[in-house]
Amino acid sequence: MPVSDEDVEHVRRAFASFNETARDREDEAGIRAHHARWYDPDVEIVNADNWPVPASYKGTEGYVRWYRENYGPYEDVRYDVDFLDAVGNRVVALVTISGRPRGEETELAVQIGLVYGMRNGRIARVELYLGHDRAMQAARATA
């Protein structure tokens, strides 16, 4: 089923919320609240290129684990969205994610691609790709 403009906007607002409410996610209650606002309860998150670690995460507990493993070691994490649109049957976001290792001054940045599957207006699946090209290829394969 094709994604709607509302689905694309939902993902856009989820990125904005992530950037605006980082301090709210410093404890587990904040992480769970962010999940409840934007994600389907049965969301599946897949590190498709085995980056940063080979893993997949399912449901609320999986989201909490994913968040802690991927963002816990960093401060001032933010997403800068370079591209966001419907591609095939998915929403694709090409982003630069940046942050600093806790207690360090050096900022790290990496370009990733995220391919979103939507269900009932919420994020139901996320595939993370290292680099933009792989994400676009994966999304086009769903068309």
Model-derived segments and their meaning:
Residues 1-6, 68-143:
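A beta-strand edge to alpha-helix "cap/lid" segment located at domain peripheries
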